[in-house]
Design a protein with these regions (language model features):
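Acidic/histidine-rich catalytic cores of soluble enzymes
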Residues: 183-186, 203
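Active-site pocket-lining/capping segments in soluble small-molecule metabolic enzymes
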Residues: 1-139, 144-176, 201-294
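Conserved catalytic-core segments centered on acid/base and nucleophilic motifs
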Residues: 142, 190-196
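Well-formed, non-transmembrane alpha-helical positions, independent of function
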Residues: 133, 181-184
Length: 294
């Protein structure tokens, strides 16, 4: 029994499931409605472990993202990640390192919502240094946690100092709870939007109606961002929010940022488990598509 069949049974029993928003007609350039993103891919060793696990499980990975920041990777590590990405057709998205939760201000310690901001002009300048360094080493996708930095990067793309096709992906640390906010981020230069982790399906539909950029959504949410596990929502998420990246967090796992050799084993194990989670989500999607009368 898949979800569609289960809903028909509930309706027969007098408990119909309320209608959801209309299907999204949006798609990625290749025509797909969804892609798989593995977050917290902290360096080439973790990326290699993720690729190995994906090969064993038959899971296609479209994007990996890294959270410790460009500043926490050596040039050689970045170059190796870019090489792995090209070899396996995976987008490599690196976080811009400076952020409020690592800075001197106490406010960032009391709310994760401001953890990704660049505090002051010095942090903004450092973010641009990270951006240019990553691009010079072959990276074509940046993970941005600050609205002002996002807009500056977009201006640098427009005047030719950064590549016109550079992906600017907003971080989950930039709250995105509604359509108007999504539209603001897109106008500021975002080309991929990480929505807030606790949104219902109707709100996702509103965000999709407000923007054409791909949506990124955690379907298992890290504990420090809410801890939801939403596997059974995924078929409806794809239907409503396409084009959408399905992100695999892992609950009951430590926050490993900034990662280093002292956490290498943990980071690799978490990367492999995220791929396993992706396999389970893909099984659900396949079951729903098999049962779709269309």
């Amino acid at each position: 029994m898949n979800l569609q069949e289960s809903r028909r049974v509930l309706e027969e029993l007098g408990h119909p499931v309320l209608a959801l928003p209309e299907d999204s007609a949006g798609r990625f350039p290749d025509g797909d409605a969804w892609r798989i993103e593995i977050p917290s891919c902290e360096g080439p060793r973790v990326m290699a472990a993720v690729i190995d696990e994906a090969s064993q499980r038959g899971v296609k990975i479209h994007r990996i993202s890294q959270g410790s920041g460009v500043m926490m990777l050596t040039d050689a590590e970045i170059v190796e990640m870019v090489r792995l990405g090209r070899e396996h057709d995976i987008e490599v998205c690196l976080f811009l390192g400076p952020r409020g939760s690592w800075d001197t201000g106490g406010q960032a310690k009391v709310s994760a919502a401001v953890g990704g901001v660049a505090r002051g002009g010095r942090a903004v300048a450092a973010s641009l240094v990270d951006a240019f360094r990553a691009v010079e080493l072959g990276v074509n996708s940046l993970l941005v946690g600050d609205l002002g930095v996002l807009q500056l990067l977009d201006r640098l793309k427009s005047d030719g100092r950064l590549p016109a096709d550079l992906v600017l992906k907003t971080s989950v640390l930039m709250p995105l709870p509604n359509g108007p906010t999504a539209a603001i981020y897109e106008r500021a230069g975002a080309t991929s939007l990480n929505v807030s982790t606790d949104l219902d399906l109707s709100t996702l539909g509103e965000i999709r109606a407000a923007t054409t950029a791909p949506i990124d959504m955690y379907v298992e949410v890290p504990d420090d961002q809410g801890g939801s596990v939403r596997f059974y929502d995924v078929p409806d998420v794809v239907r409503i929010a396409a084009p959408v990246y399905l992100k695999m967090g892992v609950r009951n796992a430590p926050n490993i940022y900034p990662v280093g050799q002292h956490l290498a084993g943990t980071a690799e194990a978490l990367g492999r488990e995220r791929v396993r989670r992706a396999e389970m989500v893909l099984r659900l999607l396949a079951a729903e598509q098999k049962g779709d009368p269309s």
